[in-house]
Design a protein with these regions (language model features):
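Histidine/acidic residue-rich metal-binding segments in metalloenzymes
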Residues: 1-159
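Terminal or standalone catalytic/regulatory effector modules within metabolic enzymes
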Residues: 157, 161-168
Length: 168
């Protein structure tokens, strides 16, 4: 789809949500995704990655989660055609709503709060769940720090949009 946009000279880039949203170890998928436009037009934005904070996790479980923002930022820094938004989490109450039903279910199992998911002849269903990001939670604090790391480590400020996870 990125190649199609370039071939057709469309005025906007592909807006992409990476796979493995919010899963420890997902930074590898993000790095592979960042390599997609590497041979395309370096003179204009060809790829916009969303909520990259949620796609910059190392480790294999919530117990050993760590930041891999440095690796993500290093990749973005070599690709002038890529723009990301950081998807910064804000401490306190929020609501997530997404068509990524499996991710909403994972959040439900983490927070044990209310959860609603609906699917009508779709590949995935939209879900809604209230979330409380706590300063006292190590995982939530790491999430918060990853967003800041991305903003500080990406050298070109026009390549990292300052966004929050919710509202977005």
């Amino acid at each position: 789809s990125i190649r199609a946009c370039e071939f057709l000279h469309l005025p906007h880039s592909v807006h992409l949500h990476c796979n493995n949203l919010g899963i420890p170890g997902n930074y590898r998928t993000t790095l592979q995704t960042l390599d997609i436009p590497s041979d395309l037009n370096p003179d204009r934005q060809t790829l916009y990655l969303t909520h990259v904070q949620f796609h910059s996790y190392g480790g294999s479980t919530w117990g050993d989660i760590r930041s891999e923002a440095e690796k993500i930022a290093a990749s973005v820094n070599t690709k002038p055609q890529v723009v990301i938004d950081m998807g910064q989490v804000m401490f306190g109450r929020t609501m997530t709503m997404t068509a990524d039903g499996p991710m909403e279910f994972r959040l439900y199992t983490l927070h044990h709060n209310k959860w609603s998911n609906h699917d009508v002849e779709l590949e995935t269903g939209s879900g809604v769940i209230p979330v409380y990001y706590s300063r006292k939670s190590l995982v939530n604090s790491i999430m918060w720090a990853i967003g800041l790391e991305l903003a500080l480590l990406i050298k070109n400020p026009w390549q990292c949009m300052l966004t929050t996870d919710n509202p977005n």
